Amino acid sequence: MTKYKYFFGSDFRSIPYLTTINNSEEAITVVTTKPVRSGRGKKLVINPVEEFCKSNNIEFKYFSQDAVYSNMDIGISASFAKIFSTKFLKSNNSIFNIHLSLLPELRGPSPVE
């Protein structure tokens, strides 16, 4: 039976977890954030996870709070730049978050920097 895994990540700290999960034999769908305009020239910049997916031929989707991943058996979130809404979590159960620091001492948006 195929298990459908979703990985939610958006920065360089996500990539080691994505690499490990991607090395398994099961299907994986990567969900990441859309490119943003940044810098003086307001150039469109893609995040490291999208870059990694493109260079390794891994299929990815852009995140939407309204999406329902009805075939998801398990979701893993690591260093993802979005906060899941309650509605999203209720529609898409079985999402686990990998927190990169000790809680509650090192909480916040950038606890390990």
Each language-model region and where it sits:
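One-carbon transfer enzymes
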Residues: 1-113
